[in-house]
Amino acid sequence: DVYKRQELIQKILKIRDKILNADDLTKYQVEIKDLEREITLFHFKAVNKCLELSKSDVDLIGFHGQTIFHAPEKKITKQLGDGLLLSQLTKKKVIYNFRQNDLENGGQGAPLAPIFHNALANELNKKFNLGFPMNILNIGGISNVTSTIEYNNLGLEEKIYACDIGPGNCLIDEWMRKNSKKGYDKEGLVARSGKTDKLILNQALDNFTEQSNFEKSLDIKNFDIFFAKGLSLEDGAATITDFTAKLISNGMNFIHNKNNSQKSKWLVCGGGRKNKYLLESIKSNFDDINLNSIDQYELDGDFIESQAFAFLAIR
């Protein structure tokens, strides 16, 4: 299963790179369909293990799939995962195509987790008296934030603000894949052993224009590691991690200004919360910031996103 997972990851990365700037996905249809079936069967094995434990308790399945293309300006997004096939295999109702449905209804297709984050903020406040504003920062491939200014169970816009704010793990992971045999920088140890090239970092930040208003969803194709070309593995990892941290920090400052509070709490989920160097770099951009892993509050930060899609599926 571990081998199969790695094989699928490589296939996903390959097709994603191939269609990165495509205007039409139809010419890749056969390749996409074949890979989609493989991914669905792989998911079925995992889902089936859960069903074996409590099949009668499962009413439906929320199936997101693997994103390989996202172009909200064209109202096109593609996640690999066949909901109909998964439904046939599990004999359960499967809710899927979350992002395409959002695009067709006037949304950006991302982020979609804020409704769940908002409900989670209320539960965390009840249990731990954390208070508001409360911000949930998800550092996945892309970083997004949900700011619950004041809890409202209807999720009214003036009480909650959410947006993509920058890269998360995508650039760091890409650098590691292309320059080493590792798929990611565990705990940021490679970056920590390197030295940031300040000149290259500042030039990259000056040239980056995707963060002007935080009103559109972001995709990996909005970012590039080209600026670090020629650096050593360690120095490149450090420079790219600090670049990522600065963009995330810019987004956090935007949220601070939006909710008129510099003292709001930040709870971090997603794989990026395990990158200690990244979190330290984010903190270094603030005089004082309350930034903690969501795991400190009896939750598992690896599963917030998957729980969000179960929540959305029920709704």
Question: Across the structure, where does each feature detected by a protein language model lie?
Answer:
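Short glycine-rich phosphate-binding loop at a beta-alpha junction
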Residues: 56-64, 260-272
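A contiguous, well-structured pocket-lining segment that forms one wall/lid of small-molecule binding clefts
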Residues: 181-264, 275-289
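Short, small-residue-biased leader/transition segments that mark boundaries at the very start
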Residues: 2-3
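Short glycine/proline- and acidic residue-enriched helix-loop micro-motifs
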Residues: 21-35, 183-188, 230-231
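Glycine-rich phosphate-binding loop of actin/hexokinase-like ATP-binding domains
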Residues: 118, 122-190
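Short beta-strand-loop/turn "lid" adjacent to the catalytic site in phosphate-handling enzymes
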Residues: 26-81
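Glycine-rich phosphate-binding/hydrolytic loop that grips phosphoryl groups
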Residues: 242, 292-315
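Active-site neighborhood for divalent-cation/phosphate handling
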Residues: 62-125
